[in-house]
Curated annotation (Swiss-Prot):
Monomer. Its cofactor is Zn(2+). One of its GO terms (molecular function) is ATP binding. GO terms for cellular component: cytosol. It is found in: Cytoplasm. This is Cysteine--tRNA ligase. A motif ('HIGH' region) lies at residues 31-41. A motif ('KMSKS' region) lies at residues 270-274. The keyword rRNA-binding does not apply. CDD domains: CysRS_core. It catalyses: tRNA(Cys) + L-cysteine + ATP = L-cysteinyl-tRNA(Cys) + AMP + diphosphate. Keywords: Aminoacyl-tRNA synthetase, ATP-binding, Cytoplasm, Ligase, Metal-binding, Nucleotide-binding, Protein biosynthesis, Zinc. Zn(2+) binds at C29, C213, H238, E242.
């Protein structure tokens, strides 16, 4: 089976055929940094982290861009509430986001542009739309005229003839009266007293929400990309409007493939800050829920399906992770006494190199994993393979933990070692890492050496080795926090 994903644009599962063979350009809509992130954000970024890891593992050269929306009404409102600047609110929440993502073992994007760093590109894009008659000024604002877009509504299925007020999303007071059509949306908002603003051909002001992503996609990846990612709540209006303005300006397709994750529900209702039914990532992790339990909880469901958040479901994930972790940490805890190699996990295909492993069942298990993940990123199917691999390893781990003699025939031990190697190899593809009991902590110099080695592994796109180094540090009570620009900070957990 070829690698296939469900395209939100066509509602069909399609073979992945990138613009350039062997490469994948991906843009993921990032957070609006006005508050801490909740479990819904965790779900989205865990899913897309696995997509990225899997594509890399399958041999693709992936360029992954994720933005920060750091100018928005929500940020301005929070700044006014707290009596601080918009920048202070943004910086605080960007830092918190990066810490949360690091704890969840989510790889940092290759680049993380900010809307405020793309003002020139935004203004250029608006000018191009204006020159094509697709933008108009109204009382200090500039709006996109949806009648100039081809097939507006093709992503969401919305009909522009539906005269729904506020349809463009994030509308300001009185904005509807300044628009020609309810679906028209702001490209540039005229300056208001006390708000940050930038000079422009239309007077001082700031960008609208949708134009920011269109400009950052073009700035970072060009006019057409392979995959555009986001939550299902962004299909309309945000992604619909991105398509309209980008394709009108550029005259070409914005993204070949659109992928959207399902929502996290609480009591049958979408988790959201506006409804007040959310739980932050930080609160969950600080309450004692392990990061890998949270990852497992998310990956047990297909990324497109709704995910019900209940105490029972989280407890079940914790139980599942306890067993999986026992198997994953077996080599680290007892590998030396068993004579096992604790080198980095093998690359894809290495399990059947040179005629294949002694146990052909491992080849079949790896192929089951690939078949599941190739089928629209079926992470629950991938996890099933991990649990199958883990069963005999858990039994051995339990015997060793009880101090029982683990004397086994050499061939059987060798087979279990191969099973463990494949388990941690595939677990790394899903971003799952063992959480061993903390050993005596390293000194600062040793930590710095390990971080340098991990940085070199990441530069070589050897993420399995990078994860192995992170795991070893975590086992010794050192937590790494990756930040944009290749910077890694650490704390003693």
């Amino acid at each position: 089976m070829s690698l296939r994903f469900t395209n939100s644009l066509t509602s069909r599962t399609e073979a992945f055929e990138p613009l350039t063979e062997g490469k994948a350009s991906i843009y993921c809509c990032g957070v609006t940094v006005y508050d801490l992130c909740h479990l819904g954000h965790a779900r989205s970024y865990i899913n897309w982290d696995v997509l990225r890891r899997y594509l890399i593992w399958r041999g693709y050269d992936v360029t992954y861009i994720q933005n920060y929306t750091d100018i928005d009404d929500k940020i301005l409102n929070r700044a006014n509430e707290e009596g601080i600047t918009m920048q202070a609110v943004s910086e605080r929440n960007i830092e918190a986001f990066e810490v949360d993502m690091g704890r969840l073992n989510i790889l940092p994007a290759d680049r993380m542009p900010r809307a405020t760093g793309c003002i020139e590109g935004i203004q250029t894009l608006i000018s191009e739309l204006e020159s094509k008659g697709a933008a108009y000024s109204s009382d200090g604002d500039v709006y996109f005229d949806i009648s100039k877009a081809k097939n507006y509504g093709k992503l969401s299925g919305r009909d522009p003839d539906d005269q729904q007020q506020g349809a463009s999303g994030r509308t300001a007071d009185g904005e509807e009266s300044r628009k020609r059509h309810p679906f028209d949306f702001a490209l540039w908002k005229g300056a208001k007293a006390g708000e940050p603003s930038w000079e422009s051909p239309w007077g001082p002001g700031r960008p609208g929400w949708h134009i920011e992503c269109s400009a950052m996609v073009r700035q970072e990846l060009g006019q057409t990309i392979d995959i555009h990612l986001g939550g299902g709540d962004l299909v309309f209006p945000h992604h619909e409007n991105e398509i309209a303005q980008s394709e009108t300006a550029n005259g070409t397709t914005l993204a070949k493939l659109w992928m959207h994750n399902g929502m996290v529900n609480v009591g049958g209702t979408k988790m959201s800050k506006s409804l007040g039914n959310f739980t932050t990532i930080r609160a969950l992790l600080d309450s004692g829920i392990s990061p890998m339990t949270l990852r497992l909880f998310v990956l047990q469901a297909h990324y497109r399906k709704p995910l019900d958040f209940t105490a029972e479901a989280l407890e079940a994930a914790a139980t599942g992770w306890k067993g999986l972790n026992a198997a994953l940490s077996l080599g680290g805890r007892h590998g030396e006494s068993l004579g096992w190699s604790t080198a980095a996990p093998l690359a894809e295909g290495a399990m059947n190199a040179d005629g294949g492993p002694a146990d052909t069942a491992l080849v079949e298990l790896e192929q089951r994993f690939i078949s599941a993940m190739d089928d629209d990123l079926n992470s629950s199917g991938g996890l099933a393979v991990l649990f199958d691999l883990a069963k005999p390893l858990r039994s051995l781990a339990n015997r060793l933990e009880r101090g029982e003699d683990a004397a086994l025939p050499e061939l059987e031990l060798k087979g279990l070692e191969g099973r463990w190697q494949l388990l941690r190899h595939l677990a790394a593809v899903l971003g799952l890492r063992s959480e061993a009991e903390a050993a005596p902590s390293l000194d600062d110099g040793a930590i710095d050496v390990a971080i340098a080695a991990r940085k070199a592994a990441k530069a070589a796109k050897d993420f399995a080795e990078a994860d192995r180094i992170r795991d070893e540090l975590a086992a010794q009570g050192v937590e790494l926090i990756d930040k944009p620009g290749g910077v890694t900070e650490w704390i003693r957990a």
